[in-house]
Regions:
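C-terminal, well-structured catalytic/ligand-binding subdomain of enzymes
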Residues: 1-41, 45-47, 51-83, 89, ...
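Short, well-structured alpha-helical segments that form the helix of a local strand-helix-strand
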Residues: 88-99
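Short arginine-rich
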Residues: 100-107
Length: 177
């Protein structure tokens, strides 16, 4: 079934002037698209999702996969996960079913977490930062939070961190792992 969700949306991404009230019919119609442009959110099962810019490629190339899978944009992918996934594994399964087409002429990655404490970072990459200049060749890579006792994380620290940088090992070839 479909989950009840809370999400946040930046209306500027829909072309609205956030310094003015929504009065015109055109602006009101644009607001109807807001549920399909979330930047983060949580659902009633405890699944939370967030989307973060990654600026991949020499001139920031958007992910633009073109296989036989159905197409989704970055924010509608997040909406789909919030509406239909109850946990991290279900969110990853949803992401694997679709070709991603990033919006706003940039690239993104996602963090998903669920009520059990499991989390994952979903990234679409192709090679290294020096070679990742063709968004159509990117593939989904999933990095799960390491909950093992041999994790480099402190014993009582069960967090996973995301920034605006790709975390896929070896992506930034000039940087040490």
């Amino acid at each position: 079934g479909r989950h009840a969700t809370y999400s946040s949306v930046d209306l500027q991404f829909l072309g609205l002037n956030t310094n003015k009230d929504v009065k015109s019919l055109k602006d009101k119609a644009l607001c109807l698209a807001a549920p399909y442009a979330p930047l983060d959110g949580i659902n009633d099962a405890g699944l939370s999702c967030g989307i973060y810019m990654t600026y991949q490629g020499k001139k920031t190339v958007a992910t633009d996969q073109n296989t036989s899978k159905p197409d989704f944009t970055s924010t509608t992918m997040l909406r789909l996960m919030l509406d239909y996934a109850s946990n991290v594994d279900e969110a990853v399964k949803i992401a694997k079913k679709y070709d991603l087409h990033d919006s706003a002429k940039t690239s993104y990655h996602y963090m998903v977490a669920d009520a059990s404490g499991k989390s994952a970072i979903l990234e679409w990459v192709n090679g290294t930062d020096a070679t990742d200049n063709d968004g159509s060749k990117r593939k989904l890579k999933v990095t799960y939070k390491n909950l093992s006792k041999t994790s480099k994380l402190k014993k009582n620290n069960s967090s996973q961190i995301i920034t605006n940088f790709i975390i896929e090992p070896g992506y930034y070839k000039n940087n040490s792992e």
